[in-house]
């Protein structure tokens, strides 16, 4: 029995819950600060840019909630059940299934937006320059959204195997990177090109690349509970 399992079976319940939930709580608070900071940065561009982000907000939130919530919750619980049953091989196969679903989700959202995204934003009230800015924002975000889906899936996988701290620390460091890049790419700080409103989704994508890469390396080379190896690559039922 490994130390983590022993702690879960023997430690008092309340301190155990606090210890396991604290990293995620702090990480999500940091993410909330990131959202507020990006809104402030975009607000420096003017009210039209801020309105364009508000118009694009439902598309962005739906993508993130599907990646981190719907798919992430399923991945976390399925891996936990497989490991709880002592079936490591199934857990590793499930991880590959999860990555495949993440890629499909990113492609589906991108395809739907390119087919009917402009109409959707018009229904939500977008027109003229406001609509053009919102479309540009969504296109940049969805073109790179595969890393958002991967981040949500991989962080859920790590939580499913009982590793709460690593994804939380990554979210905190990734959030710091995102804010720094957002300031540079939106407003031209730190000598970076001033891209305006599309700097925000680009910063999120670059931060997502950092986080998803770190989690892929962790699961491929430094994880004992579940290893992401090509020998488990299978899409069987």
Task: Give the role of each language-model region.
Residues 1-21, 79-146, 180, 184, ...:
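Short alpha-helical transmembrane segments in multi-pass integral membrane proteins
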Residues 26, 30, 34, 63, ...:
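Residue-level hotspots within pore-lining transmembrane alpha-helices
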Residues 29, 33-51, 121-128, 184-195:
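Helix-terminus/linker motif at the lipid-water interface of multi-pass membrane proteins
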Residues 34, 71, 150, 194, ...:
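A generic structural signal for short, solvent-exposed coil/turn residues
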Residues 50-111, 148-167:
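Small-residue-rich hydrophobic transmembrane alpha-helices
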Residues 72, 76, 141-160, 167-175, ...:
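Short runs within selected transmembrane alpha-helices of multi-pass transporters and secretion channels
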């Amino acid at each position: 029995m490994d130390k983590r399992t022993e702690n879960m079976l023997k430690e008092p319940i309340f301190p155990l819950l606090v210890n396991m939930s604290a990293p995620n709580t702090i990480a999500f608070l940091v993410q909330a600060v990131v959202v507020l900071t990006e809104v402030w940065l975009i607000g420096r561009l003017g009210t039209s840019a801020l309105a364009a982000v508000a118009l694009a907000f439902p598309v962005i939130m739906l993508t993130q909630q599907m990646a981190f919530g719907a798919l992430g919750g399923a991945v976390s619980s399925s891996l936990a059940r497989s490991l709880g049953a002592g079936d490591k091989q199934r857990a590793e196969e499930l991880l590959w299934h999860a990555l495949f679903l993440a890629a499909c989700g990113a492609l589906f959202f991108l395809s739907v937006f390119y087919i009917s995204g402009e109409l959707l934003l018009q229904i939500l009230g977008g027109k003229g320059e406001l609509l053009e800015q919102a479309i540009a924002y969504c296109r940049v975000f969805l073109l790179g959204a595969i890393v958002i889906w991967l981040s949500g899936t991989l962080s859920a996988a790590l939580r499913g195997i009982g590793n709460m701290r690593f994804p939380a620390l990554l979210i905190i460091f990734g959030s710091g990177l995102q804010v720094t890049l957002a300031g540079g790419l939106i407003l031209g700080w730190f000598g970076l090109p001033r891209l305006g409103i599309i700097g925000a989704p680009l910063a999120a994508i670059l931060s997502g690349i950092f986080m998803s890469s770190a989690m892929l390396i962790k699961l491929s080379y430094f994880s004992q509970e579940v290893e992401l190896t090509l020998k488990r690559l299978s899409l069987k039922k």
